[in-house]
């Protein structure tokens, strides 16, 4: 049925978003000096995006699906966490959403992850530079004549636009999650001390990120 086909499509989107976010949770963390783990992470992210597009274009493409399985193995087996602090704030906040609603994990990540990025990317120059590097190396942003901030924002914009084009939710309401003040307080209390590498996310930070999730990220 069309409903079943639609559900299968959504599950693919959410699975790929979880893969992509897993690599970012390790990549967007200290240290940000030269290291092989980050180079591998960028390659995995680029390939996840290729597999994602291919699988959505043709769900029966065996080559694309086999690539996606390899993508997911390398995204989730923690090989790219070697030498990295790791972050996992986005997952911590999303788990709070999943604790109180029936939202799919990947759908929650699609909402929270870009908003976490918007919350932390300007914390200091080296973090902004990391987001700019990601924008160039993963999303193909042209950096010539631009500040790191501008490049970083273009990268986050491309990520959000990609999620929009594949049909992922960009806000809590689009994901069917209550976003009234009492609900946001409840999610933030559950997320609590979410940790983090670039920025230590405490309960009130989580609440601010969740508040921002009422609207799509834009600069």
Task: Give each language-model segment a name.
Residues 1-5, 9:
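Single conserved hydrophobic/aromatic residue that forms the stacking wall/gate
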Residues 11, 32, 36-39, 175, ...:
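A short N-terminal beta->alpha junction/helix N-cap motif
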Residues 17:
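Gly/Ser-rich, acidic/histidine-flanked active-site/gating loops
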Residues 20:
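Conserved phosphate-interacting/catalytic interface
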Residues 23:
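Conserved core segment of the aminotransferase class I/II
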Residues 26-157:
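Active-site segments that bind and position negatively charged phosphate/pyrophosphate groups
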Residues 135-219:
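C-terminal charged capping/lid subdomain of soluble metabolic enzymes
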């Amino acid at each position: 049925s069309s409903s079943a086909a639609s559900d299968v499509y959504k599950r693919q989107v959410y699975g790929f978003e979880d893969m992509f976010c897993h690599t970012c949770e390790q990549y967007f963390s200290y240290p940000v000096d030269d290291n092989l783990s980050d180079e591998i992470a960028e390659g995995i992210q680029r390939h996840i995006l290729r597999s994602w597009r291919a699988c959505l274009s043709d769900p029966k493409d065996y080559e694309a699906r086999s690539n996606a399985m390899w993508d997911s193995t390398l995204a989730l087996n923690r090989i790219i966490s070697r030498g990295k602090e790791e972050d996992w704030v986005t997952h911590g906040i999303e788990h709070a959403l999943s604790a109180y609603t029936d939202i799919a994990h990947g759908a929650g990540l699609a909402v929270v992850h870009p908003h976490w990025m918007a919350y932390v990317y300007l914390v200091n120059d080296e973090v902004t530079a990391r987001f700019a590097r990601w924008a160039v190396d993963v999303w193909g942003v042209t950096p010539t004549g631009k500040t790191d901030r501008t490049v970083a924002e273009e990268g986050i914009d491309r990520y959000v636009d990609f999620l929009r084009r594949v049909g992922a939710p960009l806000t809590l309401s689009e994901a069917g999650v209550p976003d009234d003040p009492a609900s946001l307080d409840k999610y933030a209390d559950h997320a609590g001390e979410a940790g983090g590498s670039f920025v230590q996310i405490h309960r009130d930070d989580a609440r601010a990120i969740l508040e921002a999730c009422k609207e799509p990220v834009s600069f």
